[in-house]
């Protein structure tokens, strides 16, 4: 069996340190934290107010497009950075590969622009501006599907109740039992 080298001791110390830190971070809150159980502890906390409906709202697809383009171009920048650090070692073959890569990216960018993937304007405004729409069904209105609902639309539903009232979690001001007794 071989002797343990200083490099091995460094790895062993690192593993022991990480294990101790994880155990410490998991046990200290259990020992110092308060313990109370009840129905109120299981509910969501929204600044002391009873939650009104779900927290999920529909966002415009524009934000997802920006996120996707950011990820794609960020990865491309990472690839170009890796190439730039080794430009002397890869020579002309590496240079040719990067030129093909960048040309391919530019072709993809021109294609995305030509099909309207980078346009934030709804299809109706593009029609009025004279642009010819090349992709999608003529009956499909993406702008209407992905439009952002205003806060006023999110607060009340068509019956005039807040979402929590329509779900039955919050009683309305006039309950059906009281209104039937008055009649």
Swiss-Prot record:
Protein name per its UniProtKB record: NADH-quinone oxidoreductase subunit A
EC class of the enzyme, as a word: translocase
InterPro entries: NAD(P)H_OxRDtase_bac/plastid (IPR023043), NADH_UbQ/plastoQ_OxRdtase_su3 (IPR000440), NDAH_ubi_oxred_su3_sf (IPR038430)
Any GO CC annotation of this UniProt entry: NADH dehydrogenase complex
An MF annotation (GO) of this entry: NADH:ubiquinone reductase (non-electrogenic) activity
Species the sequence originates in: Acinetobacter baumannii (strain ATCC 17978 / DSM 105126 / CIP 53.77 / LMG 1025 / NCDC KC755 / 5377)
EC number of this enzyme: 7.1.1.-
Membrane topology summary: Multi-pass membrane protein
């Amino acid at each position: 069996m071989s002797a343990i080298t200083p490099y091995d001791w460094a790895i062993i110390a690192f593993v022991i340190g990480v294990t101790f830190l994880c155990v410490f971070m998991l046990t200290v809150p259990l020992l110092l934290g308060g313990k109370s159980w009840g129905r109120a502890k299981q509910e969501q906390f929204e600044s002391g107010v009873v939650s009104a409906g779900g927290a999920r709202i529909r966002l415009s697809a524009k934000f997802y497009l920006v996120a996707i383009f950011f990820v794609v171009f960020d990865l491309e920048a990472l690839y170009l950075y890796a190439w730039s650090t080794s430009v002397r070692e890869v020579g002309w073959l590496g240079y040719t590969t990067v030129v093909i890569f960048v040309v391919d990216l530019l072709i993809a960018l021109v294609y995305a622009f030509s099909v309207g993937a980078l346009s934030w304007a709804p299809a109706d405004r593009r029609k009025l501006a004279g642009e010819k729409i090349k992709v999608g069904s003529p009956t499909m209105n993406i702008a209407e599907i992905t439009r952002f609902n205003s806060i006023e639309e999110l607060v009340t539903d068509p019956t005039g109740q807040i979402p929590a009232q329509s779900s039955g979690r919050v009683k309305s001001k006039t309950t059906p039992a009281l209104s039937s007794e008055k009649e």
